[in-house]
């Protein structure tokens, strides 16, 4: 029995590099050569570790969603209130619009627009990520209702869907070049609609 050669690269770093590239360029515009260069690996290592570009993309999308959800959950736990968490998320969009760096939007939203209509596997991954995101916002809304910041007469499930829809729209606006004041105004309307 022969033992295969050990991997000569960190699979997590390679996955992270691929995720950033897909996020910046999209799935179709990212070539295998782009991926190999960004990941710092050979073609044979790529196929051995990831199988195909599509399989790699599935892993990248899952990594993105899991990282985003974990970050939001942690922020919610640390927040002084559910409403403060929601306001902080909105404020981060204003900061993103104000930054001079590349505005890539949201990988899940970008992927929905690019692939979800014609790729059932990707559509399911995006739907699962969106459902998890709605779960975090529903938890924030329920907490804010217990704290008296959002009326209990409003359905948490509906408000969480509203917040995720707003977040998706705002991320798209930021990616499209909307100025910080416009994003700030829309965020303000979003928060007001909760109360």
Regions found by a protein language model. Give the residues of each.
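Hydrophobic alpha-helical segments that form the core
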Residues: 104, 109, 154-173, 186-192
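Basic, helix-initiating cap at the start of DNA-binding domains
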Residues: 1-25, 29-41, 55
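Short hydrophobic/aromatic patch on the recognition helix
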Residues: 40-50
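Amphipathic alpha-helical segments used for helix-helix packing
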Residues: 85, 100-121
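Amphipathic alpha-helical segments enriched in hydrophobic/aromatic and basic residues
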Residues: 22, 31-32, 43, 53, ...
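C-terminal peripheral helix-coil segments that are non-catalytic and often amphipathic
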Residues: 1, 88-96, 131-147, 166, ...
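Hydrophobic alpha-helical connector segments
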Residues: 59, 73-103, 156-160
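All-alpha amphipathic helical-bundle segments outside canonical DNA-binding/catalytic cores
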Residues: 124-128, 146-162, 181, 185
């Amino acid at each position: 029995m022969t033992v295969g050669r050990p991997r000569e690269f960190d699979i997590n770093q390679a996955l992270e590099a691929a995720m950033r590239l897909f996020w910046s360029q999209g799935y179709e515009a990212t070539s295998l050569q782009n991926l190999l260069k960004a990941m710092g690996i050979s073609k044979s290592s790529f196929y051995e570790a990831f199988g195909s570009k599509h399989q790699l993309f599935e892993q990248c999308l899952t990594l993105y969603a899991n990282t985003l959800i974990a970050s939001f959950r942690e922020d919610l736990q640390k927040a002084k209130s559910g409403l403060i968490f929601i306001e902080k998320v909105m404020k981060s969009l204003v900061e993103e619009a104000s930054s001079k760096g590349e505005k890539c939007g949201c990988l899940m939203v970008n992927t929905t627009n690019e692939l979800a209509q014609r790729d059932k596997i990707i559509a399911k991954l995006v739907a699962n990520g969106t459902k998890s995101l709605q779960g975090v916002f529903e938890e924030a809304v329920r907490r804010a209702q217990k704290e008296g910041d959002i009326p209990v007469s409003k359905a948490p499930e509906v408000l969480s869907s509203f917040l995720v829809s707003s977040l998706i729209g705002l991320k798209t606006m930021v990616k499209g070049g909307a100025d910080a004041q416009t994003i700030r105004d829309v965020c303000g309307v979003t928060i007001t609609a909760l109360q």
